[in-house]
Amino acid sequence: STGSLGLDLALGVGGLPRGRVVKIFGPESSGKTTLCLEAIAQCQKNGGICAFIDAEHAFDPVYARKLGIKVEELYLSQPDTGEQALEICDTLVRSGGVDMVVVDSVAALVPKAEIEGEMGDSHVGLQARLMSQALRKLTGHIKRTNTLVVFINQIRMKIGVMFGSPETTTGGNALKFYASVRLDIRRTGQIKKGDDVIGNETKVKVIKNKVAPPFRQAEFDILYGEGVSWEGELIDL
């Protein structure tokens, strides 16, 4: 389960599918990490073992606890390079000992050559190549061990686009092809209590779905410090 009733319905299989790669992308502060943390909490409730690869070095254990995550039972890794992060992900998946791995985020998977290089050096296509190699290797193991792997990705703007969408995600096209489910998450409005903003109205579109019909969408509220509002969803349903 994703922690959102509406999104579980939109996904068509009652939540995120096991043995698959899932990509969640959206602008900054749209609720990508919150959605993943909610899914981890649900997975743990069902006795699952979860891992969080925090390439952004931004994991907040206090917030995670508020969302119902047993932090002491969560495998947490904060790798230094993109290679290290993907190697850890592959090792966890191959072990067959974890049910769900979250990588936060693809944009933060910086290749070693880029970290060790000079500021002005050109590293065109390095990250895309890294992702492509890793996913080719990973998908077989994911299928075999029936692990769910979720990649979080940010949206960037392409410069000088005249036609079509100027939005793009980092890390090349490999993830688009290898992901069985792609979720586009957006903040559509604010939730206020008096003058105070207490949360965000959120919309998730299922852009790609290989396990059920795609293009469904769900709307729900994410409250600051609390996560997805179950009550709000029940009332809406």
UniProtKB/Swiss-Prot annotation:
It is found in: Cytoplasm. Its main location: cytoplasm. Keywords: ATP-binding, Cytoplasm, DNA damage, DNA recombination, DNA repair, DNA-binding, Nucleotide-binding, SOS response. The keyword Hydrolase does not apply. It comes from the Bacteria. InterPro entries: AAA+_ATPase, DNA_recomb/repair_RecA, DNA_recomb/repair_RecA_CS, P-loop_NTPase, RecA-like_N, RecA_ATP-bd, RecA_monomer-monomer_interface. Can catalyze the hydrolysis of ATP in the presence of single-stranded DNA, the ATP-dependent uptake of single-stranded DNA by duplex DNA, and the ATP-dependent hybridization of homologous single-stranded DNAs. It interacts with LexA causing its activation and leading to its autocatalytic cleavage. Belongs to the RecA family. NCBIfam families: tigrfam_recA. This is Protein RecA. It comes from Neisseria sicca. The gene is recA.
